[in-house]
Structure formats: C-alpha cells, structure tokens
C-alpha cells in the first residue's frame, strides 16, 4: 500500500459487500449480540451508490434461509409479493420449434413455495432491517485491499477518490480510509477482488477442485399486460447454444407486468467464434419467448459472472482474521440456478461461528469452527446432493452427461456413493 496518511475507523466486524450473504451475516451477528445483551459494532461496506445498485437480477427465491433469519418477514413487508404459480421447462429446437419437458424429469426446476422477486429490492429491504439493528452501512465505498499484520487480516482499506483515468491524483483527490476490525468478512460475490486476494494469500483452495464459471446476461422488461402471466417461471435449454455447450436461459414473470430474463453460458466452451451476447439476442427471437416480449419495453440490462463449481470447488472458508461467505466462497447451487438462499445461509453460519468465539478471553483469529458448522447444516446437504451434476456433463458430454445427471437427481436424489471431480479450471 502507498504510504499515505489515512483516517482509520475501528469496528468489531467489517463486512465487504451488501448483498444477501453480507447482510445476512451482519443481521445474524447483531441478533445474537442483542439476545445475549452484548455490544458488537458492525460495518458493511458497499461499492454501489446505494444498496442494490449493482444487483440486476430477477430471482426465483427459496425463502428457507429467510424463514430462519427473519421469521416475521411477511409482517415486516419483505418485497416477496409474487409466489410461483407455474413452472415451464422447454427444450428449444430452433427459432420456431420447442417441446416441453415435464418437471417430473426436471426436478431441480420445481419452484412450488418459492417467490419471484427483484434481488436489488430485497437487498434494500434487508439493509433497512439491518440499519434498524444499528448496523452501519456505507454505500459508495470500494474495498481496495486487505490490511494484513503478522499474517492476520486486521481490516480493509477503501479506495481513493479523485483519481483520473491515468491513475493520477486530481485536485479533488481524497485518500481512502482504513476500516480496522477484529474480524473481516468477505461477501463480494463471484470473483470478488478481496476474496481472490485472501484465497491466494492463504492458499485457501489448495484442497479443493478448480472453480468453474459462467457469464450471465440479464434484462428487465415491462411486458404488454395482455401477455403477462404473473407467477410463471420459464426455463429453457437448447437452441441457439453451440453444439456441446450447455447454455441455459430463463424468463420470470414478476409483479406489475414486469419480467426478468437471462441467458447463461459456461466459460468452458472451446470455440473462439462463439458470441454469448449474440446467442442471447437470438434466444429472445425464439417463438416461445418472443411472444412475451413483443409490445414490451426493456428497462434495464447488464451482465455478471456466476460461480458454478459447486461443492467440490468450495475453498476453505476461514483464514486468520476473517471468512469467505456467499459467492466469494462459491455456495451457489447451479443445478437449481439458485444462490441467494445458499449465500444467506453461509453468512448465517459464519455469524454463528464468529459469535461462538468473539467474547472469549482469548478468541481464535482463525475461525475454523465454520467448517464443522457448515458440514452440519442443510446448506452442506443441499450442495452435496448437487455435487455430481456438472462433473457428469464435463466428463461425458452434454447429452449423456445431462442424462446421467438427471438420473442422479431424479432417481438417486444426489446420493450416489461416489463424487466426481473437476479436473481443470474452465477459464
């Protein structure tokens, strides 16, 4: 770090990222402190101008973790207003033709009891709840680097402001601040900047499989009310994906005639001429999708990396002075295309592990109890059941691999007596 005099602030816990994992960590910590009549200062740093500003996602949300974290969420007005009414899974043959796949054979796409929501709105609601618990949330601050002292993370430095495109200081330059903490929780999402630093610095992934990633394109549309079907969840596969590439796509009908759509391409394709963005544009012209978009208006769009290595690729979640949670750790359940409830639960597990140790006379800096707490949770059970889905496809190809993965999920419920592994990274 450049030798610049910086202001410092001290907290018991600093959390980087105000997504579902980071906010769940903060809320669970504060709930435990209040219940035990203890003081605990918590700060959440968020790079967006406001919480949710960098989260463009329609989301089919499993409320399992939320039921545990905030049991009275309905009474408190959580923005979960659209229960899933119907699932549709379709295989696209070409621009005109497709056929339906019964959800009996697509068990990972059954969404009864789930909700269609805006993840950005949900995170804003969680942030308001957290602030009501006197948790400090600082939007508009990037976390530029870890502060490490004698091999222990003791906080983070926020990014400097007033830097031009050449890296030179402008007249408006202001140095970042040091946020010092007894524990630092990294919840930045997929390929988080500080998460990568911690994984490299402490060799957290030396005993795990290589990680795997995808690129997801997302859009939000206002649909013509005559074609909007509130509560409908559509998942598709097939056309226009290139041969041998297991791309997937979705269209979720939310409230107020709004729809969320997206197209996901894994990064292990070997044809350099594939254009994931162009495939997304083609997909929107497939007859079963276009019928909903005609007469509608696109209101937002973006793209995001997503993490999909699964159970075998999760690194060690703890390091001296902190922990990884959510997609910094890789807790997404890719076969279900769901990561919000798993991210929340990982944050809650981290909070419980930290709280168990925090008030001891000589607390551990390396909270290794998070590993055993994770292994005894429903999160471990869920991710373990899904562990062979992607390796089957990587090992046996798209058609046979999907068939074997389907047998694993449908017949054996993810309980085959062996674990396949990712042999190499896909990036």
Where are each of the predicted segments found?
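Ferredoxin-type iron-sulfur electron-transfer modules and their immediate structural context
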Residues: 78-84, 89-93, 377-427
